[in-house]
Regions:
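N-terminal glycine-/serine-/threonine-rich phosphate-binding loop
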Residues: 3-52, 61-71, 183-188
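Short beta-strand segments at enzyme active-site cores
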Residues: 13-15, 48-61, 112-117, 191-194, ...
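Short acidic, glycine/serine/threonine-rich loops at helix termini
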Residues: 24-26, 60-65, 125-131, 203-205, ...
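A glycine- and small-aliphatic-rich helix-loop capping segment at beta-alpha/alpha-beta transitions
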Residues: 28-33, 65-76, 129-138, 205-213, ...
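Polyanion-binding loop/helix "lid" in catalytic or ligand-binding cores
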Residues: 30-38, 80-99, 103-104, 168-185, ...
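Ligand-binding beta-strand-loop-alpha-helix segment within the catalytic cores
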Residues: 69-191
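Glycine-rich beta-alpha junction loops
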Residues: 117-124, 196-199, 239-241
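Acidic, metal-binding active-site segment of PIN/NYN-like and related structure-specific nucleases
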Residues: 230-248
Length: 299
């Protein structure tokens, strides 16, 4: 019967957005406890769970702390973006796995929850590297911005607020640790992987070189769900469902969509570039690999 149970279990990939994690260390601890209850409900209902998460506020906080450290200690080398990303995976993963483990134990479920530090390969010639768009870190003065530009980094000005660093958001190619993630998932474990989109790396012979970039967390959630042949991808966000004419007086709920309908609305530019569009693209990419699957985009 054990094998039957294993086959019966529906595999779900859940992607957690900022609102599921909070913006500061204390906010995160509280937010994660609420999120853990929802995740535990899925485990209790018999789903095999793989979790991925955003790390926008966390990676910015770490990047800012490392940059400030450099100001105080001149000899200190600032941490590159890929190292900040690795730190955020550990820190967010630690909070999620402990909260979820405790929540499961309180329900009498003994299940290992583990975080897999995940790297994702990207193409060094990805056009995103020539046109960085992802804003990270704190506001800077003009002097600081000029220093960043001299270092070869990209900076944009937000009128009246200051300057901010922007990095590339290349497309994910391969999840390096996918076999480890798959083995844990197949063994019925709860896995946290590809946090913050994964650490972007470029293959150089046998070595993996960290890239100064971040991967869109929604696109990696779609890739992960496809690679694991998940039955469902759940993308948690700040709105209850997908809308057309979002934010206008003609706003309309889209409670269910086929891939072709989603593609048609996409052509009409119905989905916001920075928020809903990457989620729709992730859904389409996953469903192209797993046509029997389904995607839930909700709060």
């Amino acid at each position: 019967s054990f094998m039957n149970n294993k086959i019966m279990k529906k595999r779900v990939v859940v992607s957690l957005g900022h609102q599921a994690l909070g913006y500061t260390t204390l906010e995160q601890r509280d937010a994660v406890q609420i999120t853990a209850r929802a995740l535990a409900d899925l485990v209790e209902a018999g789903y095999q769970l793989t979790i991925t998460h955003s790390n926008g506020p966390q990676v910015s906080m770490i990047h800012k702390a490392m940059t400030e450290l450099r100001r105080v200690y001149i000899d200190y080398t600032p941490a590159p973006m890929c190292v900040c990303s690795a730190m955020s995976q550990g820190y967010v993963g630690y909070d999620i796995q402990n909260s979820l483990r405790a929540e499961l134990l309180s329900r009498g479920i003994s299940r290992t929850v583990s975080t897999v530090l995940t790297q994702v390969t990207v193409d060094p010639y990805d056009e995103a590297f020539y046109e960085p768009t992802k804003i990270i870190g704190r506001y800077m003065s003009r002097d600081d911005a000029e220093t960043e530009i001299k270092k070869g980094n990209y900076v944009i000005e937000e009128p009246g607020k200051g300057f901010r660093r922007v990095v590339a958001a290349p497309k994910p190619i391969d999840i390096v640790e996918i076999e480890a993630i798959r083995l844990l998932a197949d063994a019925g474990q709860v896995v946290i992987a590809c946090g913050g989109g994964g650490i972007p790396v470029i293959e150089q012979k046998h070595a993996l070189q960290g890239a100064s970039a971040v991967i869109e967390k929604d696109s990696i959630a779609g890739k992960l769900a496809g690679d694991l042949k998940a039955d469902q991808l759940i993308i948690l966000t700040s709105v209850p469902c997908v809308y057309k004419n979002f934010g206008s007086d003609r706003q309309e709920e889209l409670r269910s969509l086929t891939v072709s309908e989603a593609m048609a609305y996409r052509e009409e530019r119905q989905f916001g570039e920075g928020n809903m569009l990457p989620k729709i693209d992730a859904a389409i990419a996953y469903l192209n690999v797993c046509p029997q699957g389904s995607v839930l985009i909700t709060s």
